Amino acid sequence: MARLRRAKRTSYRRRRRTTRTRTVVTRTARSTVRRRGGRIVYRTSKTTRVGTRRMRGGFLPLLAPILAAAIGSIPGIVIAAKQK
């Protein structure tokens, strides 16, 4: 007799499968604990990188405050030039 398989119910939007990462700071070294399936994988690194963020958005966001200050100072320069 053939056994019928029930159709698996899936939600409308499928969830992306990601691995959970948890950072554990110990006295000796910083280790990253990754859960993959049922296993736990330990990764340790000798050098701890703190505060090294990569600049996102390219070069323009870095120039934005400088450009804003330059544009804001134009009226003051014009007024000072007219007074002479």
Curated annotation (Swiss-Prot):
Main location: virion
Biased composition (Low complexity): 21-31
Residue ranges with Basic residues bias: 1-20
GO cellular component terms given for this protein: viral nucleocapsid
Locations listed in the record: Virion
Keyword Mitochondrion on entry: no
Pfam entry (one): Adeno_PX
Chain segments carrying region Disordered: 1-35
Marked site: Cleavage: G38, R39, G58, F59
Alphabetized UniProt keyword annotations: DNA-binding, Late protein, Virion
Propeptide position ranges: 1-38, 59-84
Cystine pairs: none
GO MF annotation list: DNA binding
InterPro entries, per database record: Adenovirus_late_L2_mu_core
Family to which this protein belongs: Belongs to the adenoviridae pX family.
Protein purpose: The role of the precursor might be to condense the viral prochromatin for encapsidation by virtue of the two basic domains.
Protein name: Late L2 mu core protein
UniProt organism field: Snake adenovirus serotype 1
